Curated annotation (Swiss-Prot):
Keyword list, A-Z: Endoplasmic reticulum, Membrane, Nucleus, Phosphoprotein, Unfolded protein response
Region (Disordered): 117-196, 440-508
Cytoplasmic side: 1-413, 435-508
InterPro entries hit by this protein: Thioredoxin-like_sf (IPR036249), Ubiquitin-like_domsf (IPR029071), UBX_dom (IPR001012)
Native species: Homo sapiens
SUPFAM superfamilies on file: Thioredoxin-like, Ubiquitin-like
Location relative to the cell: Endoplasmic reticulum membrane; Nucleus envelope
Record protein name field: UBX domain-containing protein 4
Function: Involved in endoplasmic reticulum-associated protein degradation (ERAD). Acts as a platform to recruit both UBQLN1 and VCP to the ER during ERAD.
Expression triggers: By ER stress-inducing agents such as tunicamycin, thapsigargin, DTT and the calcium ionophore A23187 (at protein level).
Modified residues (Phosphothreonine): 489
One GO process term, biological-process aspect: response to unfolded protein
Intramembrane features from the record: 414-434
Nucleus is among the record's keywords: yes
Length: 508
């Protein structure tokens, strides 16, 4: 269908100028509108409405549809209005119809339009005859004046048959007929009028031909666009079908490969089951022998492991590594046979420390246990001191027989014992008040854990030199670290060089 591309007023003017039927197709977005549009685009409908019809297509949501509905109410969508020259609808198609039905309606509308046009022409001719007859009857005697007035009218008004004729021959014959009836007074004006009429006729014909060519060109463009869209749609359908076929083939190939893999796995499983059955049948007779051999090998392996475990435990239990921790914080280590009595370890400790702590006893801290005289006769292995253990030396009071009385020694010892705390406090206060620079560290060990016992150190020749050095270097009892003073110990010099574990214990 060749739709008019302009606005509604332009389409109405074109229809009136060509004497055609004005067709308005109101379409929407529903399925019926799509079907009706397809019926309008049918070749039969296009051929039937090619002449005497000016069609325009408007959308229900457009402004043109709103203006059109104010004059012609749009009851339903889609709707097709066939409007004649007088503006009265000749036919209204509500809803969607088939292409054949639409062609029938178009023929019917064309017949109605032709009938109305013929009726209007007949009515116009009758009115003209009725007007001319009274004018002739009113003046029967003045024939000359009537003829002159008629000739003047013919000279002033060009014949209507010339302007409405479609062919040049018909116009020329009508012109010759009228010119033969003209009087001699109009003979000089007629050639100029005939030339103007011919120019107008030729101009109209050229315009009609241009319009026809333009319409033909538009129709060809529309057909080309339709063909292009049809070809594009066919290409898309072809590509879609090819993709679907390719996908289908790939899916079938994949399913076939899966089926083959599944069958191959089943065959392998069956073969494995057959092999297992054959092996079971082959080794059924020797199964008990194999199990007995395995049991014997397992027992031998367990016995070997037990022997290795015992030998390892025996090797570990043959040596006992004992760490002796002294009251001043120092320690020393020695190894003993695991079957040696605890008395041997005590004698080694006594030889090492000498008579520094007098009579002492041994004890363990974890678990806390102090060994008695009966324990000294037991083996280190029985006391759970093998393969390694840490033993603490606990000083005790010396026996009375080992004390040698000396009058001068006892007095000075008693005075030193009584005055020692006061001297220590006085030195601490003086150090704080006068803030003397700290002396250099010495490697001499000073026992600060317990005050000297006068009963145990009065006649000890080994401890007298130590006591004298302690009294001479009493100013070294305090160690300054920034603004903090602390008492010195005998291990201050060694603590910085010792190696400590992560749990604040010294490595052995």
């Amino acid at each position: 269908m060749l739709w008019f591309q302009g606005a509604i007023p332009a389409a109405i003017a074109t229809a009136k100028r060509s004497g055609a039927v004005f067709v308005v197709f109101v379409a929407g977005d529903d399925e019926q509108s799509t079907q009706m549009a397809a019926s309008w685009e049918d070749d039969k409908v296009t051929e039937a409405s090619s002449n005497s019809f000016v069609a325009i297509k408007i959308d229900t949501k457009s402004e043109a549809c709103l203006q059109f509905s104010q004059i012609y109410p749009v009851v339903c969508v889609p709707s097709s209005f066939f409007i004649g020259d007088s503006g009265i609808p000749l036919e209204v198609i509500a809803g969607s119809v088939s292409a054949d039905e639409l062609v029938t309606r178009i023929h019917k509308v064309r017949q109605m339009h032709l009938l109305k046009s013929e009726t209007s022409v007949a009515n116009g001719s009758q009115s003209e005859s009725s007007v001319s007859t009274p004018s002739a009857s009113f003046e029967p005697n003045n024939t000359c004046e009537n003829s002159q007035s008629r000739n003047a009218e013919l000279c002033e008004i060009p014949p209507t048959s010339d302007t409405k004729s479609d062919t040049a021959t018909g116009g020329e014959s009508a012109g010759h007929a009228t010119s033969s009836q003209e009087p001699s007074g109009c003979s000089d004006q007629r050639p100029a009028e005939d030339l103007n009429i011919r120019v107008e006729r030729l101009t109209k014909k050229l315009e009609e031909r241009r319009e026809e060519k333009r319409k033909e060109e538009e129709q060809r463009e529309i057909k080309k666009e339709i063909e292009r869209r049809k070809t594009g749609k066919e290409m898309l359908d072809y590509k879609r079908k090819q993709e679907e076929e390719l996908t289908k083939r790939m899916l079938e190939e994949r399913n076939r490969e899966k089926a083959e893999d599944r069958a191959a796995r089943e065959r392998i499983k069956q073969q494995i089951a057959l092999d297992r059955a054959e092996r079971a049948a082959r080794f059924a007779k020797t199964k008990e022998e194999v199990e007995a051999a395995k049991a014997a090998a397992l027992l031998a392996k367990q016995a070997e492991m037990e022997v290795k475990r015992e030998s390892y435990a025996r090797e570990r239990s043959t040596v006992a590594r004992i760490q002796f921790r002294l009251p001043d914080g120092s320690s020393f280590t020695n190894q003993f046979p695991s079957d040696a009595p605890l008395e041997e370890a005590r004698q080694f400790a006594a030889q090492t420390v000498g008579n520094t702590y007098g009579n002492f006893s041994l004890a363990t801290m974890f678990p806390r246990r102090e060994f008695t005289k009966e324990d000294y006769k037991k083996k280190l292995l029985d006391l759970e001191l093998a393969p390694s253990a840490s033993v603490v030396l606990l000083p005790a009071g010396r026996p009375t027989a080992s004390i040698v009385h000396s009058s001068s020694g006892d007095i000075w010892t008693l005075l030193g014992t009584v005055l020692y705390p006061f001297l220590a406090i006085w030195r601490l206060i003086s150090n704080f008040l006068f803030s003397n620079p700290p002396p250099t560290q010495t490697s001499v060990r000073v026992t600060s854990s317990e005050p000297p016992n006068p009963a145990s150190s009065s006649k000890s020749e080994k401890r007298e030199p130590v006591r004298k050095r302690v009294l001479e270097k009493r100013g070294d009892d305090f160690k300054k670290e920034g603004k903090i003073y602390r008492l010195r110990t005998q291990d201050d010099g060694e603590d910085e060089n010792n190696t400590w574990n992560g749990n604040s214990t010294q490595q052995m």
